[in-house]
Each structure stands twice: as structure tokens, then as C-alpha cells.
Design a protein with these regions (language model features):
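Active-site beta->alpha N-cap acidic-glycine motif
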Residues: 27-96
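Active-site gating loops and adjacent loop-to-helix segments of metal-dependent hydrolytic enzymes
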Residues: 100-127, 238-253
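Conserved, mostly hydrophobic/aromatic
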Residues: 38, 85, 157, 223, ...
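C-terminal domain-boundary segment and adjacent tail
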Residues: 185-188, 244-300
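Catalytic domains of cell-wall/extracellular-matrix polysaccharide-remodeling enzymes
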Residues: 130-210, 214-216
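Bacterial N-terminal signal peptides
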Residues: 8-19
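Bacterial N-terminal signal peptides that target proteins for export
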Residues: 1-9
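Acidic (Asp/Glu)-rich catalytic clusters
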Residues: 49-55, 72-84, 101-114, 148-149, ...
Length: 300
């Protein structure tokens, strides 16, 4: 005959199992923020963003206002109020044979550019250069002015390739700009950061789904995504900073990777995962509405 202690332990375990199951089924749903980067890079990225926007799902996009195709992105985004807009602050130009420079022009910020007036290719090269912090602030402010006068509502900023936040001094510049324009800074809301950037092309969707299945409750789970339609203009893009984006023989794979991430965003599996797990998709505009824009990470 079972002892009283055994019966008590069994009852406690059964109660715990029921409580855990109830929490998983009826507790606070996981919160996920989808941030799609590099908007305005080219036509193929812009058309991919529009395809995702047409699904109606809420998500955030980071527009690069120093990029050649930002104006097309602006006009497209005005048609899709479900899309929240931020600024991808740019201090680098990473592609081979496809370059850009500062909004202010090379003569206004000479310490930020190479000999022909383009941004430097990598974060390391930028940090090793003799950049002037005052020029950094003026250029990033010019990018923000272009963004805020575009007709789009801007709610946050982030850093292309991490460069604008790579040192405490650079971060302080961005914080001043964010406060000036009353916007938040991505990853300053206590987000759990995730990406499928380095996932194999044929595993982008499955890696995203597996990651969402592990989403932390009580936290904002940030997923940084890079989408594009695979087109001739994308097929020739060679990433000079990330070997995983090119084959071992030097063939560019960027187009395949970004098409894979677009496929993941448009997949039936993603839609079913969001519905089945009651995932709450949020944007930075919603995070700001909770307590104002955040420009500094929360203290642990």
C-alpha cells in the first residue's frame, strides 16, 4: 500500500504537470518582433519587402537612407501601415562593385570615406581609420533628417553591420541622435536576439521555425531577417565581409541566402507556427507605446 508521503508526492507532481500544461496552453503568449533589414538597398530587396508586407503581418523594417534605392522603399512603405519603420544607420559599404557614400557627400565628412568617396567596407576598417566623431554625428544626423522628412513615421534606429554602435563613443553619438529625434534604439528593450543569417540556404525556414518554438515568454524575441528576391542584380553581389555568403570558389551566394529568408517569411510553416503557438507579433512602435522610446539597454 502506498505511503502517505508517496501519495502526497504523486499528487504534487500531477498538479505541477497540469499547471505547466495550462500555462503552455493558456498563459502569456510568446512575443516576437520581426525586424527586416537593408531596405532600400536595391529593387530586389524592396520588392521582397513588399511581398512580406502584403501578408498583413506586423513587422519592423530598417531602411538605409544612404542607399541608392531608398526613395522607392519610401513610396512602397507608405502603402503598408502594418509595417513599422526604423533607420538602419550606415557607415559602411560592403559589396564589391556596388558602393555608396555619405548623405552629406565626401567633402563634408572626409574621415568617413575612402579615396573615391565611398564608405569603408568593414567595421574593422572603419574602426582602424582616423574617423572624426563630429563627422560621424553630422552624417548620422543627416540620415535621420532624410528619414524624418520622407513622410514615413520613424520609431527606432539600429546599426548597419553594428558599426555605429561598435564603441562606447560611437554608441553615445547614436544615443544623442535617438534622443533628439525621439526614437528608440533596437536591442535597448531587453530583446532576445536571433537570426538565420548564417543558416544553410535550404534550412532557413526550418531554423526559423525551430527558433520560434523556443521563444522565451515574458521577453521580446527579436528576429533579424534579410530578404530579397533572387534576381540578376542580386546574383552578382559579393559580400566582402562574410565568407558564408560566398562559395569556397568565390561564387556569390547572397542572392540564394536572401531568397531563402524571404521564403521563410512567406512560408505556410511560419503562418501555422504563429497561429498554433499564439505568438504575438509586435513592432518597435508598440514597444515605444508601453513606456516611451528606449535608447539604453536595461541594467541587468
Amino acid at each position: 500500500m502506498p505511503s502517505f508521503r508517496t501519495l502526497t508526492l504523486t499528487l504534487c507532481l500531477a498538479t505541477l504537470a497540469v499547471s505547466t500544461r495550462a500555462m503552455s496552453q493558456g498563459g502569456t503568449p510568446p512575443e516576437v518582433l520581426l525586424r527586416l533589414d537593408d531596405v532600400g538597398m536595391n529593387h530586389s530587396v524592396n520588392t521582397a519587402i513588399e511581398r512580406v508586407a502584403r501578408t498583413g503581418m506586423p513587422f519592423s523594417v530598417s531602411v538605409m537612407f544612404a542607399y541608392p534605392w531608398y526613395q522607392e522603399a519610401v513610396e512602397m512603405l507608405k502603402k503598408h501601415p502594418n509595417v513599422n519603420v526604423g533607420v538602419h544607420l550606415v557607415l559602411n559599404s560592403e559589396w564589391r562593385n556596388y558602393r555608396w557614400g555619405p548623405v552629406l557627400g565626401k567633402t563634408a565628412v572626409p574621415s568617413l570615406v575612402d579615396s573615391v568617396g565611398y564608405f569603408l567596407p568593414s567595421t574593422r576598417e572603419f574602426l582602424d581609420s582616423k574617423y572624426d566623431l563630429g563627422e560621424v554625428e553630422r552624417e548620422l544626423d543627416a540620415q535621420m533628417q532624410r528619414a524624418t522628412t520622407s513622410g514615413l513615421k520613424i520609431t527606432y534606429v539600429d546599426f548597419h553591420m553594428g558599426t555605429a554602435g561598435a564603441t562606447p563613443q560611437l554608441r553615445a553619438v547614436v544615443e544623442r541622435i535617438a534622443e533628439k529625434y525621439r526614437v528608440g534604439i533596437s536591442r535597448s528593450y531587453g530583446e532576445v536576439s536571433n537570426t538565420i543569417f548564417s543558416a544553410p540556404v535550404d534550412q532557413k525556414t526550418s531554423e526559423l521555425i525551430k527558433g520560434l518554438a523556443r521563444a522565451e515568454r515574458g521577453r521580446t524575441n527579436l528576429w533579424v531577417i534579410h530578404v530579397a528576391e533572387r534576381t540578376p542584380e542580386m546574383d552578382v553581389l559579393f559580400d566582402r565581409n562574410n565568407a558564408a555568403q560566398n562559395s569556397g570558389t568565390g561564387v556569390p551566394l547572397v542572392a540564394q541566402h536572401r531568397q531563402g529568408e524571404l521564403d521563410a517569411m512567406l512560408s505556410r510553416e511560419l503562418a501555422e507556427m504563429v497561429k498554433a503557438n499564439r505568438i504575438k507579433l509586435v513592432t518597435y512602435e508598440q514597444l515605444n507605446a508601453r513606456g516611451g522610446p528606449r535608447v539604453r539597454p536595461p541594467v541587468p
